[in-house]
């Protein structure tokens, strides 16, 4: 996961128009591909949870994720209606849709459950850690951290083996590059900063898959750089 700089100004014109029509709701909003496109561009074409690349803004390639679930935040039972609130909408991958439950992840595995690990919260995203084994986690110091790890491991299923393997590969590739460039010596700050810049940048509006894994690794190395 990485921080998503959510901006209501990025919502598409079709959604703004729809919100002014009588009896508007999520189901009768017919221009969802325009919404998908806006969400993907805002996120640099990666999933809001696992950070895998989402290639196209259509319903066969991605889900419109309601961070606060539609089934709860629909304007009933004293809850606000967030079903068309742009600040509640994210782009999620398909998460192995159609597979057995234990093989699903992201929005597909989350379903109607609520999570606290909010990719739009910069402070919470600052708690995210990765390790050489490819796992994503939060260092536990309090009850909130335990709940965040439950979200990562169970509700979102982000430590499913396929995702762990992909993150581990990125980590190992960077380690190999470091050894090739510097051997047993500490890397230079200029080299590390250049790599951070590369992994933080968007190529034609698109982040690299799981870019935050690389950025986390490189920022750790930067502390030891010379």
Which residues does each predicted region cover?
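Long, low-complexity, intrinsically disordered segments enriched in glycines and aromatic residues
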Residues: 100-159, 163
